[in-house]
């Protein structure tokens, strides 16, 4: 059985019709010129100074847990803490795409969405590697099934992307 210490097994399951948010905070994730979401938008990252911390899940926002427009704008600004200053000098925007939980789950059997411990506004999108474990970043895009899954997830939000100017 797959498990992750951040999954809140006691938390309320995510409703099939719940609207989820994926922040798009980098040209690696969304091309403003072509208006295309990249497959990297749902990939798992390597983080840390030496890229030794591998992401276990893609963090998604829960629209239902964001109470008003001010809180929503504050949530959108979280993308700035994801990328370091050097990368932000090249960014001109932040953006996000929305989708229903059940639509993401329908893209591939590997996709699982779970509530996270201590995180009301966030949930985790996990990718099942086998019956015992989840993938850790980055995903093996040379695997056709993984590539198609990421492509389907990108297509899922492509028509819902909202782009706003970066903070000044």
Please annotate each region the language model reported:
Residues 1-58:
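ADP-ribose/NAD+-binding catalytic cleft of ART/PARP-like enzymes
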Residues 3, 16, 40, 72, ...:
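Terminal low-complexity, poorly structured segments
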Residues 7, 19-21, 39, 66, ...:
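Weak global preference for isoleucine
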Residues 10, 24, 40-42, 79, ...:
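Compositionally biased, intrinsically disordered low-complexity segments
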Residues 11, 34-35, 86, 118, ...:
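Intrinsic-disorder/low-complexity loop/linker signature
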Residues 13-16, 23, 35, 68, ...:
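Short linear sequence motifs
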Residues 47-125:
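ADP-ribosyltransferase catalytic core
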Residues 103-168:
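Active-site or metal-binding loop neighborhoods of secreted/extracellular toxin and effector enzymes
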């Amino acid at each position: 059985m797959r498990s992750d210490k951040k999954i809140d097994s006691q938390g309320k399951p995510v409703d099939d019709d719940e609207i989820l948010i994926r922040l798009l905070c980098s040209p690696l994730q969304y091309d403003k010129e072509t208006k295309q979401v990249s497959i990297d938008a749902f990939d798992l990252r390597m983080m840390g100074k030496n890229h030794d911390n591998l992401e276990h899940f893609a963090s998604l926002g829960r629209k239902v847990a964001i109470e008003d427009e001010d809180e929503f704008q504050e949530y959108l600004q979280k993308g700035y803490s994801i990328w370091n200053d050097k990368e932000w000098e090249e960014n001109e925007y932040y953006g996000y795409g929305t989708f229903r939980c059940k639509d993401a789950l329908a893209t591939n059997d590997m996709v699982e969405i779970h509530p996270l411990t201590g995180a009301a506004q966030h949930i985790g999108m996990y990718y099942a590697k086998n019956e015992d474990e989840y993938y850790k970043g980055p995903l093996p895009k040379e695997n056709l099934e993984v590539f198609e899954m990421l492509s389907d997830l990108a297509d899922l939000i492509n028509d819902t992307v909202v782009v706003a100017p970066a903070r000044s």
